[in-house]
Amino acid sequence: MTKNIETDILIIGAGPVGLFTVFEAGLLGLKCHLVDNLDKIGGQCIELYPEKPIYDIPGVPNQTGKEHIDSLLKQIEPFDYKVHLNQRVDKIEQSGDHWIAETSDGITFKTLNIFIAAGAGSFEPRKPPVESPDKFLGKGIDYAVRSVDKYKDKDIVIFGGGDS
């Protein structure tokens, strides 16, 4: 099923930058739609480190990833926006003075402005080379720390590099 939506701004990414874009656009009276591949608003702040303190937000000594996203959501409450989760933008093309963007769920957006706030992109864990690793998900294998209490006073093993 194809759905057509006209909006002032299409924002790709519903993390902190996408949410702040809603705020700035809202101050100008513009209507926004956000599209995100994740199943919830907040990007990496929610997906990877909801309980981890963040120290480099201007004017905020520290707050967790969840607190940061909650603050941004509170800030944009008065504004006109809609969120489309579990979708990605598969195609963008220019049509006259507008942009046409199509999502994986069959939504077609017509807009004058597209703001790409995709950050580091969609979080895709590198799964261990064992048979059916997802059957152990939450039972010994986790791809992100969503609650530090789950691991408190326990021995853990971390496999990986980079941000692991």
Show the residue positions of the predicted features.
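Rossmann-like dinucleotide/flavin-binding elements
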Residues: 3-6, 10-39, 137-164
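Short amphipathic alpha-helical segments
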Residues: 22-24, 46-47, 126-130
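Helix N-cap at the beta1-alpha1 junction of Rossmann-like dinucleotide-binding domains, i.e.
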Residues: 38-41, 122
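A short acidic, helix-capping loop that chelates divalent metal ions and anchors anionic groups
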Residues: 54-59, 125, 152-153
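N-terminal Rossmann-like dinucleotide/flavin-binding domain of flavoprotein oxidoreductases
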Residues: 46-108
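Glycine-rich, phosphate-binding/catalytic loops in enzymes
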Residues: 27-29, 50-52, 131-134
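Glycine-rich beta-alpha-beta "Rossmann" dinucleotide-binding loop(s) and their flanking helix/strand
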Residues: 105, 114, 118-144
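Short hydrophobic core segments
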Residues: 10-12, 108-121, 159
